[in-house]
Amino acid sequence: MRNKYLRRARVLERDFRAVLRCFAHDLPALTAAKMCGVNKNTTHRLYGLLRQRMVALAEAEARPFVGGIVEIDESYFGPRRVRGKRGRGAGRKIPVIGLLKRAGKGFAQIVPNCSKTELLRVVHGQVKGPATIHTDGWKAYDGLVWDGFKHHRVHHHENEFARGKRHINGIESFWSFAKTRLAKQRGVRADKFPLHHKESEWRWNDRRDNLYSLLLKETRSYPLN
């Protein structure tokens, strides 16, 4: 059985397209299996392959931010609360640093911690040339000015969320998007989180496009293995 979208698989092309449409609409794999009449194990496998392709696309499309206004924020993914743990990123949460260029694309990177060293490493890797950086008041952002950036803060701890054009609403919208879609998964294993994390980035950056058409064209040109 030949499938021009998928190598070495006994899946009808119409079934693949049906599962792909569900995946593009971000439906859970079990829901897709029921809607498409495809075995749930097969559907989970297809979702995994499509997720890996999304990650490859996200990495291929990533470009440094050159100049302009860049919003930076850190967030934490994982259990809502761990008994006895307090503070930023307490417990078993996974720290992620996010950057978003105004009127442009976003970029998020998993890090060991959100220390000043890690933050500056990610910033210097992603932001090139003179840029104006907007952050919250977290002390780890100290020193951006000394590294040649213009730096504006909004102090959330003082109930300040915007001062004119000074805000980080864009990257916070990305966090909301990512956490909402991950919540639909009803739990993601830590070893699978990097895939889901980059998938969220790609979906966010291409959210105004027809994801089904993009992925159909991609898998037609470069079939999944």
Where are each of the predicted segments found?
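Residue-level recognition of single "structural anchor" positions
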Residues: M1-N225
